[in-house]
Amino acid sequence: MPNDHFSNGKKIAFTVVMFLYINLALTIFWILKPLKKSLFIGLYNGDQTFKLGSMEMLGSSAELLAKGMNLFIAFMLVVFLTLVSRLAKRQRLTYCCMGLIIAMTFCFSLQINDPSESTVWPFYWFGDLSISLMLAAFFSFLHDTVDLRNAKRLYGFIVLGAVSGGAVGSTYFRGWIEEMNNQQWLHTIIGIGVVICLLAFAAGWMAKSIPHHESKSGPNDVPKKKFNAAIEGASLVFKSRYLIAIAGIVGFYEITSEVLDYQFTAMIERFVPKKDIGSHFGTVYAIGNIAALVVQLCFSIFAAGFPKYRIHWILLALPLAVALSSLFFIIAPILFAASLLKISDSTFAYSVNQTGRETLYNPLSRQEKYVARAFVEVFIQRTGKVAALLIAFLVPMFLNTRNEAGQLETSLLGLQLLGGFTCIIVALWFYCVKIVGQKFESLECEQQQATTIALAQAQEQPSAGTT
């Protein structure tokens, strides 16, 4: 967002529009998340189990299989985003992604009030697909219009929109879960999607005077004609230690997040009555998102006043919170501790960690921002999920038992063992944060020097013309 093209008034207007854009995108996600999860877990409640050959599974274990399918979905999504981003930039990418989401939402709304097993599974996958599409379109637009000089100052406020959207969506769902049926929730999502397209149009109109923000091409950039979409992104990532470390942060977060989510879901499945499952999900999600809103608001104020903060400090907040809550759950495997696992994840993952992670892409070349980011944030993210699911799947397979009524029951010991595994992953996560922190500061210094030289040359040219 160079000052030559944007007045202060336009900067404020653009920031407000992008704030509302990400706010509504996350509102959609936090309506879909408890809705899809409660439908899925409620489908296999002990009386009815999911059968895979001779194996019987509860909803929490069947959910692991549903998430495992995300790897294939991720591959197709990387290809789709890479190909579409070559033809559509900024607001046009939003139109493509949001149009697909609206069409799919309408199709599900025709069956969602009385869903069969064949509807619940695709709807569960749709929940993950929709947020990946919305975030990819949003952050690609944002990175293409904001330069590094403004990124650390503005990203905090814009990501505050994401956090507030989470608080609005989860709180609204919790408050109206008894009043609205499933179809009405999906009709609400369609309406929000149309508004997002209008906001993208407004942001695109304001940003049309800004040339596509492009950092100097790096030596690792890959000619587009040489590779297909997925391989192109992988080639960029694995030739850069910086991008590998970013991929590590994303992958290790997804592993820990999925393990925490399984522990949380299994505890709810074991201790919460079926009729209260949706309400409990909504309550925990609302608490986590409201806490994230408070954290992000405080951070945004701090970042605006002190834009030269060190990036690695905010990237350490989430893994530290995950480690502490996991240790507490190992000591006391109760419903409160399991809920705290999810709250600690939501509080920092959707606030300062998201801000820091997105800022890491800003000093990269355009090809890395679009193609490498799509590979990391979609494919690596889903790969991390699948790795966690395979590990978590072993717990019910070997340790689950049956209660006195003959129903399957999740093993508390197995859930505690997963807590120990999480602590090991967090240690690797810390190492990746150290690498990106050092490299980001180096890239930041290089861009500041380049900006200083460019300004000096611009001042010398008028002087030379007058002599």
Name each model feature, range by range.
Residues 1-21, 46, 63-64, 80-81, ...:
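Intracellular loop-helix junctions on the cytosolic face of multi-pass helical membrane proteins
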Residues 14-46, 50-78, 119-178, 225-236, ...:
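Substrate-agnostic recognition of the 12-TM MFS/MFS-like secondary transporter fold
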Residues 60, 90-91, 148, 182-186, ...:
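Membrane-helix interface/capping residues of multi-pass secondary transporters
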Residues 99-116, 320-334:
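C-terminal ends and interior cores of transmembrane alpha-helices
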Residues 120, 153-209, 279, 283-294, ...:
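Hydrophobic alpha-helical transmembrane segments
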Residues 243-253, 311-318:
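Alpha-helical transmembrane segments of multi-pass integral membrane proteins
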Residues 297-314, 330, 394-402:
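Flexible, glycine/threonine-enriched loop-and-boundary segments that flank and lead into catalytic domains
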Residues 313-352:
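C-terminal transmembrane helical hairpin of 12-TM major facilitator-type secondary transporters
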